[in-house]
């Protein structure tokens, strides 16, 4: 069963671009190494451009757990966290229905 993780966070004022750049680096450096990764979406709020929501889809919870426990992933997250006001608010779950065009 596919696994979805969603997290919401706010960038420190003036560090919005650093957050976006961090996700771009993840795509270039981490994504090719991550087994089971399907897709991700990084979105910023229409009401506050420093507020973000990320949704990441993996083929299974096992793939998600393998990535989240990887030391390189941990280092990437700590770099991202240095640009955030507080720890993200997380949601992890099983995909019950997935609709695409």
For the regions a language model picked out, list residue spans one by one.
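An amphipathic, aromatic/His-enriched active-site/gating alpha helix that lines ligand/cofactor pockets
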Residues: 25-38, 57-91
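Short, surface-exposed ligand-recognition loops at beta-strand->loop->(often short) alpha-helix junctions
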Residues: 10-23
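Generic structural motif
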Residues: 12-14, 59-61, 95-98
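Short, well-ordered beta-strand segments in beta-rich or mixed alpha/beta enzyme
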Residues: 2-10, 40-70
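Short, flexible segments with low predicted structural confidence
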Residues: 2-4, 19, 35-36
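Glycine-rich beta-strand-turn "strand-cap" elements at beta-sheet edges
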Residues: 1, 39-50, 76-101
């Amino acid at each position: 069963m596919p696994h979805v993780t969603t997290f919401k966070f706010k960038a420190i004022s003036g560090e919005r671009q650093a957050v976006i750049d961090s996700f771009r680096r993840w795509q270039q450096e981490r994504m090719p190494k991550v087994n089971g990764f399907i897709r991700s979406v990084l979105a910023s709020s229409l009401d506050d451009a420093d507020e973000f929501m990320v949704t990441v889809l993996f083929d299974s919870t096992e793939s998600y757990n393998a990535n989240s426990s990887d030391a390189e992933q941990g280092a990437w997250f700590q770099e991202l966290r240095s640009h955030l006001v507080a720890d993200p608010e997380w949601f992890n779950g099983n995909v019950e229905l997935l609709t695409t065009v």
